[in-house]
Regions:
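Extended substrate-binding grooves/exosites of carbohydrate-active enzymes
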Residues: 1-322
Length: 322
């Protein structure tokens, strides 16, 4: 059984617990992006051995094989289908299809104040893709919550809360048993414009110093670290002096493995661990990331050779802890 109780936290089968999760992209590093069940199992075994108990499928619908493995191995899952809604992050992104009519008939009639512009006969692609995901995975016991987006630019819109409400209601309609969250990074906008208030679980991406403010300003009485840390490190590389630094760059394009270096927007993991330990209303976190991945080699994210792998992973591309 799942319970999310205001001021008290998350209960699984009647026992309070904190999410000790990671965010993972869908790829398998040098093995590529095609599903390999043995490689997925290997990743999950490494994560489980270090104490991880939850996976956030950032930021795409998961492979059925991954969900089946999480059912089998006892992981909890946050399933997250979107990295953008109707407002673009990149030229070729999902915003091109979000409100476009799909080939699927509408499940319910459109409301007069409905945010979707294509009203009656066909679902938008956003709704159709959500419904397909929800119906596919709502009977999987590993799935404990749905996330309707990651750092969507729509947070900054005055109408953003309406889109969030629409997606939340689709989740509730198809699965009334699980809560809905979204990974928010525009905390001022999310709090001031009502975006965070319409979610069942407000998910904060980074901004660990804003958790307490969010808890006091929002009605849910809970805060989730939906994406945390983004500490950077390179396996076997140790920089001296060993000091806490943000955005540190070196001629060898590496980062220190002392876990003291982060990016300008992020922090070392100790901050997030303390939030979860000190506040019952903080229900845990999903660290960015469980495994390194190709792309986003911050702090060397300059589109220049030789940097091509992320440095965020607790475990690197070779499946060796950093």
């Amino acid at each position: 059984s799942l319970q999310f109780v205001a001021d008290q936290g998350f209960m699984l089968n009647g026992k309070i617990r904190k999410f000790q999760g990671v965010c993972n992209h869908h790829d398998l590093g040098p093995l590529g992006a095609a599903v390999n069940v043995s490689a997925l199992r290997h990743q999950l075994e490494l994560l489980k051995d270090m104490g991880c108990d939850a996976i956030r499928t950032s930021h795409n619908m998961p492979a059925p094989e991954l969900v089946d493995l999480c059912d089998e191995m006892g992981f909890m899952m946050m399933l997250e289908p979107f990295d953008e809604w109707e407002k673009a992050k990149c030229e070729g992104g999902y915003h091109r299809f979000f409100y476009e009519p799909s080939c699927y008939p509408s499940v319910v009639p459109a409301h007069p104040d409905e945010v979707r512009p294509h009203a009656a006969e066909r679902m938008t692609w956003a709704e159709a893709d959500m419904v397909n995901m929800l119906r596919h995975y709502r009977n999987n016991p590993s799935v404990v919550m749905w996330s309707v987006g990651n750092e969507v630019p729509t947070q900054g819109s005055d109408e953003g809360y309406k889109v969030a409400t629409w997606l939340r209601d689709i989740c509730h309609r198809e699965d009334p048993t699980r809560p809905v969250t979204s990974g928010m990074d525009q905390i001022d906008n999310a709090l001031d414009k009502g975006f965070a208030a319409v979610l069942d679980i407000p998910g904060f991406n980074y901004r660990a110093n804003r958790y307490e403010e969010g808890y006091h300003r929002l009605p849910q009485g809970l805060v989730l670290g939906s994406e945390t840390a983004s500490t950077v490190s390179s396996r076997g590389v140790y920089k001296f002096p060993a000091t806490k630094r943000a955005g540190a760059m070196y001629p060898d394009h590496q980062s220190s493995s002392y876990d003291l270096e982060s990016c300008w927007w992020s922090n070392i993991p100790d901050v997030d661990f303390a939030n979860a330990d000190d506040h019952p209303w903080c229900i845990g976190q999903f660290v960015w990331t469980g495994f390194d991945y190709l792309g986003e080699p911050s702090p060397y994210d300059t589109d220049a050779w030789p940097s091509h792998s992320s440095l965020f992973g607790i475990i690197d591309l070779a499946s060796i802890p950093t």
